[in-house]
């Protein structure tokens, strides 16, 4: 009949502009304030949604807070309707609605007439919201389990702020390193700013200024790995010494996390990949959100973990770093997990895959994560003793490596992996089985594993 035809690709300027914006408020503004058809459509549905939400306040809830929370908790919105309205500017958008002949609820007009132009307001560490019933601002009564870093920072608790990370005093002798990447604020890839801030925080603990630390923030994802552009640039320019130095800097930092004088509690959530896993694993304890998608995925880009990830997986496979390695089965499982770049689909699965330890804490409500991590850090700080440096790691050695090589050869013959995949697998097997020095009767130490890990990483980075 000719009625069917291929779908035309539609492009709107407002979407392009919004995509380039970094934070949610700027994205929403870009979508609503443009002059193309896409923006007009977005404003139309947004204006109707905001007015509808305002009209429902006294019907389905006594306050705006529970409506916002219902949309966030029940429907996965990043912000509730009244939080969105604040982002857009209440007075500005209300004037626009009135000029377009829309009927704005009277309680919003009364709020604006009172001199208040936002539904929520933060002052001196306290958050208030406008109550239509009382026709005045009301203090937001947060649960003692909740901890909002942005709210806490209004109390002048930021010790130092860098481009991508900040040091924050959480109170009670606990320090926090918060990530806020300026390059990719949703993925938070590791850069030198992260490493410098973590090292500075550990220095402050070692000097006795703080007794414990939390590694965590409240962004979209914990950390999606290293800055691959930097590694690629060094590799393209054959700057192997600089690349090796960068990897060693990361390794040294993760070892400092492991052996710090005070306990460090990591709080991973959502995407926690590659280098993000390597930051989390050496901590004294982890308080993970139930929805944590964790994995060492370096094999996917032709590398192996380079920031200590192999060492952590070995220690985790040895049941928390103690006891003798069983006849290679545990390392074989680790080899499969890292070699196939398996990503846990939950914090519980991350325990099963060996990314997390069995005694790590899992929480369902992310609003409770920082407070839970802080409480755990305080508990651990009592008579805290750093772990013992391991010089007694008994790994499978050449015998175990041969078995892994045979498995790789079988995968290659079946067409499941390429020649280069096989090469990556052999490098990974070399590290996990303890290189040339290891064997069931010969022990290796932690630094040796880190050294051969770094050598393998740089070697693979040089492959074309």
Report the location of each language-model feature.
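N-terminal glycine-rich phosphate-binding loop for ADP-containing cofactors
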Residues: 1-220, 229-249, 255-262, 269-272, ...
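Extended, composition-driven regions rather than compact fold-specific motifs
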Residues: 224-226
């Amino acid at each position: 009949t000719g009625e069917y035809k291929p779908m035309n690709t539609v492009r709107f300027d407002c979407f392009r502009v919004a995509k380039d914006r970094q934070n949610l408020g700027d994205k929403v503004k870009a979508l609503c304030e443009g002059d193309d058809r896409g923006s007009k459509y977005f404003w139309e549905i947004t204006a109707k949604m905001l007015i509808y939400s305002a009209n429902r306040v006294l019907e389905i809830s006594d306050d705006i807070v529970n409506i916002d929370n219902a949309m966030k908790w029940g429907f996965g919105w990043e912000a509730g309707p009244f939080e969105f309205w604040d982002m857009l500017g209440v007075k500005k958008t209300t004037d626009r609605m009135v000029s377009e002949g829309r009927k704005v609820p009277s309680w919003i007009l009364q709020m604006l007439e009172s001199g208040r132009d936002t539904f929520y307001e933060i002052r001196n560490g306290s958050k208030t919201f406008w109550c239509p019933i009382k026709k005045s601002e009301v203090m937001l009564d947060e649960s003692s389990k909740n901890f909002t870093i942005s709210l806490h920072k209004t109390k002048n608790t930021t010790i130092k702020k860098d481009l991508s990370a900040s040091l924050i005093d959480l109170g009670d002798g606990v320090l926090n390193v918060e990530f806020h990447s300026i390059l990719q604020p949703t993925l938070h890839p590791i850069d030198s700013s992260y490493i410098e801030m973590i090292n500075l925080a550990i220095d402050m603990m070692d000097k006795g200024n703080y007794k414990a630390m939390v590694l965590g923030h409240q962004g979209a994802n914990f950390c999606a790995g290293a800055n691959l552009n930097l590694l690629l640039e060094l590799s393209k320019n054959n700057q192997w010494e600089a690349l090796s130095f960068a990897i060693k800097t990361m390794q040294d930092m993760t070892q400092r996390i492991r052996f710090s004088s005070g306990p460090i509690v990591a709080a991973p959530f959502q995407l926690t990949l590659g280098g993000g896993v390597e930051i989390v694993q050496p901590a004294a304890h982890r308080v993970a959100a139930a929805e944590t998608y964790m994995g060492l995925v370096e094999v996917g880009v032709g590398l192996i973990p380079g920031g200590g990830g192999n060492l952590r997986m070995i220690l985790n496979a040895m049941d928390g770093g103690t006891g003798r390695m069983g006849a290679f089965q545990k390392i074989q499982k680790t080899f499969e997990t890292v070699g196939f770049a398996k990503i846990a689909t939950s914090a519980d699965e991350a325990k099963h895959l060996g990314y997390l330890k069995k005694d790590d804490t899992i929480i369902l409500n992310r609003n409770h994560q920082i407070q839970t991590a802080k409480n755990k850090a305080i508990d651990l700080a009592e008579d805290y003793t750093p772990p013992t440096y391991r010089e007694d790691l008994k790994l499978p050695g050449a015998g175990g490596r041969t078995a892994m090589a045979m498995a790789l050869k079988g995968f290659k013959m079946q067409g499941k992996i390429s020649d280069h995949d096989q090469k990556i697998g052999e490098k990974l097997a070399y590290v996990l089985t303890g290189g040339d020095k290891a064997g069931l009767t010969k022990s290796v130490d932690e630094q040796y594993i880190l050294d051969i890990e770094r050598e393998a990483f740089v070697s693979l980075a040089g492959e074309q």
